[in-house]
Amino acid sequence: MTRPDNEPARLRSVAENLAAEAAAFVRGRRAEVFGISRAGDGDGAVRAKSSPTDPVTVVDTDTERLLRDRLAQLRPGDPILGEEGGGPADVTATPSDRVTWVLDPIDGTVNFVYGIPAYAVSIGAQVGGITVAGAVADVAARTVYSAATGLGAHLTDERGRHVLRCTGVDELSMALLGTGFGYSVRCREKQAELLAHVVPLVRDVRRIGSAALDLCMVAAGRLDAYYEHGVQVWDCAAGALIAAEAGARVLLSTPRAGGAGLVVVAAAPGIADELLAALQRFNGLEPIPD
């Protein structure tokens, strides 16, 4: 039986509050580090991570530290897996009565560095490797997307709380599709080859630059579908649940060794089979190693 403090609704509330607090922190720190617009590298505030084109900033690490400190106060003893600070290597091995918090302090760091208003704080609560609650704060828009298993998906903004539903599109040719690209040259080449096959099949394609926001846009009906290779669990832990609870069909590949990351697909139900068949036809459901 689920402990009362592990009920999805309660975990969602924790995630929503933390995401909103962290988003406010990110907005303030960005102004301190970069000024009103991008100013160089913020005097050394940006460094490379997995490749020269994969940045991490002092604000990423500061924000994750804030979230870890808050969770230590609110949920002492809960394991934490964060993009910058690491955590359990296998979240599925966590005891069934324990919640693991999966954190991405800034999803869309390149956008953040350049001052493009599409980056997010993502917080997922997982039990046995399955997300049961989560929240994604769109930092620049000052909105929070959230969901809990069986309780639907919602958007909270200055006007209140709104139920999210994905679109009713039923033809792939009329779908607005989101996607993203990895950081390694090899991965990008393979992704570009696949995209060349997919573009003629859809209405148009958007590259937002944040997997968490892409998934939330599917939930909100601002995209009809989204797919991407090389996604990490912290990128999609919250967003995938939000899309699913809004009615989207969501596919997450099984993690594999070798650093390939996950294949993530989310689509309005009326086009999901058609999109999955198209991706399968061009070998687009297989992970792409870095």
Curated annotation (Swiss-Prot):
Q: Which Gene3D superfamilies does the entry mention?
A: 3.40.190.80, Fructose-1,6-Bisphosphatase, subunit A, domain 1 (3.30.540.10)
Pathway involvement of the protein, from the record: Polyol metabolism; myo-inositol biosynthesis; myo-inositol from D-glucose 6-phosphate: step 2/2
Q: Can you quote the record's cofactor note?
A: Magnesium. Co(2+) and Fe(2+) can replace Mg(2+) but lead to a partial activity (30%), and Mn(2+) leads to a partial activity of 13%.
Listed InterPro entries: IMPase, Inositol_monoP_metal-BS, Inositol_monophosphatase-like, Inositol_monophosphatase_CS
Consequence recorded when altering D104N: Less than 4% of wild-type activity
Can you tell which superkingdom this protein's organism belongs to?
Bacteria
Q: Which reactions are catalysed by this chain? A: a myo-inositol phosphate + H2O = myo-inositol + phosphate
GO molecular function annotation:
inositol monophosphate 1-phosphatase activity; magnesium ion binding
Q: What is the effect of changing D235N?
A: Less than 4% of wild-type activity
- Binding-site residues for Mg(2+) 1, renumbered to this chain: E83, D104, I106
Protein family per UniProt: Belongs to the inositol monophosphatase superfamily.
Protein name stated in the entry: Inositol-1-monophosphatase SuhB
What gene name does this entry carry? suhB
